């Protein structure tokens, strides 16, 4: 299983998702709010290819297991993307960061039985999303990144989402140029609110110097930060 994305011809972010082998085809695991847009985008790329693209979001769900639970099962390896079959369904260690645990992509009708077989206990989703935020991996409201940020600025290289040895793909020219010429000066970072509120698009300052912009404001906020700017200092407070 792998982490992947769709970019604009300019290399800007469109959609991110995980690709999982399932029987004679593949399943795409993405944020629920992005299903319709991603489905339409993939249908455009289909052209005359003998490929059938289906929206199965009402039939399949994703359950998240801890990394330790995954490694307690037979034939597992502590490697991002490591994939096994569990009762005919796909179970894989998150390809972005193994600290996020494993994902079970399963038909909704079989979910309860699999939870019972795995002896899983329910956990607060907030704990999972808080961990993801801490690790710098946005999973909610990613639509606010669309066309606003380069894929490489989303830390896709660190999240195993870019292969610089791969052949041509949409958005490759700018992505490769930024990488090879060491032009990456901004990155997506998680931010924590000390006081007040954030709004999408707000400029972030340090000592009256602009160093970034808020892109995701709700629940688990993220900002595009000029991390190479001389005014950017780690472990300090900023204001908007």
What name fits each language-model region?
Residues 1, 77-84, 197-202, 235-236:
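Glycine-centered loop/turn motifs
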Residues 1-16, 20-23:
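Acidic, proline/glycine-enriched N-terminal capping motif
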Residues 10, 21-23, 46, 184, ...:
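A generic beta-sheet turn/junction motif
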Residues 13, 152-162, 172, 176-240:
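Glycine-rich, small/acidic residue-mixed loop/short-helix segments
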Residues 18, 29, 105, 167, ...:
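Residue-level recognition of well-ordered beta-strand positions that form the cores
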Residues 18-135, 205-206:
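Acidic, low-complexity central loop/insert segments
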Residues 100-188:
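Anionic-ligand-binding alpha/beta catalytic cores of soluble enzymes and soluble regulatory domains
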